[in-house]
Amino acid sequence: MSERVLMKGNEALAEAAIRAGCRHFFGYPITPQTELAAYMSKVMPKIGGTYLQAESEIAAVNMVLGAASAGVRAMTSSSSPGISLKTEGISYMAGSDLPAVIINVQRGGPGLGGIQPSHEGFLLLFHDVGDHLVVHTSVVQFQLCLPHLLVGIFAGYIVGD
């Protein structure tokens, strides 16, 4: 039986992506997902991957778009306000049927000053700028579903086409 390891949620997401074959990470630091990017910055060079801190959220998602267009397994992550900046790039990827993993590590405020629950990032599931499905797993499902979900996405499966 394999050894059990206790790690933070951000690090577990990064490790799941790596085990699913992700070798390219493009991101921009924003709390609370900075730990995910920091983990990728340590591990990617050790496995022959690419870690690049972009100059903005928009640049990061467009780097993922370029990588996905070239047929490589790439991902980015952000937090709710950063995901808002990435929606145009996300829509281009969806419209082009390009697989990518985009992690939204949600937080409360500052956009609405905390008048909505801290899970307001879920609104993006239904009100994005494109007409495409967003694959979403709830937190309780991560241990069982996430690695398999990432493998499916990286393999190029388009859900709901």
Residue ranges with predicted function:
Residues 128-161:
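N-terminal low-complexity segments that are often proline-rich with Ser/Thr-Pro
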Residues 1-125:
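Thiamine diphosphate
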